[in-house]
Structures are given as C-alpha cells and as structure tokens.
Amino acid sequence: MATKLRLESTSPFQGLPELVARDEGLFAAEGLDVEFVKRGADAPTKVDRSITDPDMVSAFASHGSAEQVGGAAMFNACEWGNYRRVEDSQTGSQQVGRRAIIAFGALMVAPDSDIYTPQQMANKVVGVPYHAGTHYLALLMLEGFIPRDSIKTCLAPNGSRNRLDALLNGEIDATTLTEPYITIAERKGCRMIVAAPYHGTEVASEEMDAPTYAAFNRAVREAVKRINADKRKYLQYFIDAHKSDPDVAALTVGDLNPSRLQVVDPAPIPAEELQRTYDWMHGWGMLKTIAVTDLVDDQRQLAGQQA
C-alpha cells in the first residue's frame, strides 16, 4: 500500500522536479501517493506602498499556510524565507534539506524607466513579495551596489504576473520576477537591472518521517536526471503552468533561456552556508530569537539522503 504524502502546491520555477516526479510516475515507483494541496489563500494580491517592513505581514501568507494547519506534511520555498518560517512556526516544523531546483530571479524596470544600473536604484521603491525568495534576493543583489539605508521596498503581490502588471502600471519603480515572466517582461521592453540564482529548502512537519523523505528524494533525483538530459522538453512546464495568460500562451520553448533552468540533487544545507545566511538575516533584523542549531532537523536531513 502506497504511503500518502501531502505537499503544498508548487510552480515550475520553484518545484519543477517534484512536478516531473509526479507526472512521470517517479513518486509512485517509490511507493508514494503524492497529493499537492492548495496554499496561499491569504497571499497579497496588490501593491501596498504603506507596508515597507516584512514584519508587517505574515511569513505564512503563502508558503507554509497549509502545513501550519495540518493540511500538508512538507513545503518548499526559498531558503531565507524558510529560516523565518521555522522561527515563526506554531507546529515545530523544521528544514530537512535543500530542494532540487535552483530558482532564478531578476530585478526589472519598466521600458520608460530612467534606471539602467543597480547604482541608480538608491531610494527607488522596489515592490517585493515579502518573505518570498525574490524579496530577499533583491536585498542581496542591491546591497552590493548601494547602502542598505538606500534600499527601499514595499509590499507587492505574490505571483510574477501581478507584479509585472503593477510595474507596467507605474505603481512601483522596480520589481522582482521569475520565469516565464522575466521573458514576458523582456518582450514588453522591460530591462533587467540585476539577476541571480538562489537556493530553496524543504520544511517538514513531524508527519514527515525519514523513510518517506528518503523516498521523496530518490524520486526527485531521478527527475533531476531527466530534466538535465533534456531541458528544452521540460521548459514546456513553464508555459503550460501559465497558459491561461495569453502572453505566456504565445511563447514557445525556444523563447525561454535554458540557462535559467538549473536543477541539482537535493542535499543537506552546508553548515557554513547555514551560518552565513543566519548571520545575514540577523543583520537585517529578519530573524529575532531562534538559534542557528534549531533551524534544521539534522537527523531527518541526513536520513533523508539515504539511497
């Protein structure tokens, strides 16, 4: 009898290997009956320039919202946001390892913007989805060019389509996007100011035991192998996931940049990287009291990598 595993819903830019593992029977081959459950009913849907501090909104508005009420055993999201979610968790959930996909995010401006370089971003309002990956990515990318006190952000909606619309409508000076909306934005004449790849992690409740996590990772590793063998085939997922959007439906795989799709085997979070990320988040005041040793369930992390 298959083991039932409920995961929070995901998108290709952050969870392509899991989607491939589901669609190609890789989870089933490991004895897992995987169900993706909805999340994010309370996620922001519009820009709010009066909200300029991530502490003003919940870290669980989208990612983790189902897990926190017992609806899912595990979810993946950006590594930084998951540090904060572990600190804020009411269920004792912890990180159990890094996810397979390396997400790609870009900070972009509208075609008529007078901003051409990161240095020109000082005191410009960047709309970001607080506690999601490109929120933190924007800070990391910009602080290499301008002082921290010159980086200005406000709350922007979840979903790159919503943020792109806000950018084109002039509601914000810049925003962050993921694929396929980086490509859509470029086709509309928007400019990429700075971009980078970034890691994510898996956060699990106590419901997720080590053998189940190991089986999950075995399926994901096979999906990684298949994606890396034929990226163009799997880039179609980025179109299909958003095909209700006419702009995306008009794309072909040839329009997407395969270098922005990177997947690796899921793995433990290296201790030195864990510490650096922890220190960086403390430096921004985005972690409060949690100890670095409480961020990860080391036992499940190691056991979950068993072949």
Model-derived features: positions:
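Short secondary-structure capping/turn micro-motifs that flank functional sites
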Residues: V37-K38, A43-P44, A73-N76, T183-I184, ...
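Short, low-complexity disordered leader/linker segments with a strong preference
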Residues: M1-A2, A307
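Short, glycine-/small- and polar/acidic-enriched structural segments
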Residues: A2-T153, D173-T176, V194-A195
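Conserved C-terminal helix/tail region of periplasmic/extracytoplasmic solute-binding proteins
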Residues: D279-A307
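Ligand-binding pocket scaffold of soluble enzyme catalytic domains
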Residues: F36-K38, N158-L164, L251, D255
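Secondary-structure end/capping motifs
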Residues: A210-K288
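Pocket-lining segment of extracytoplasmic ligand-binding domains
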Residues: C154-H242
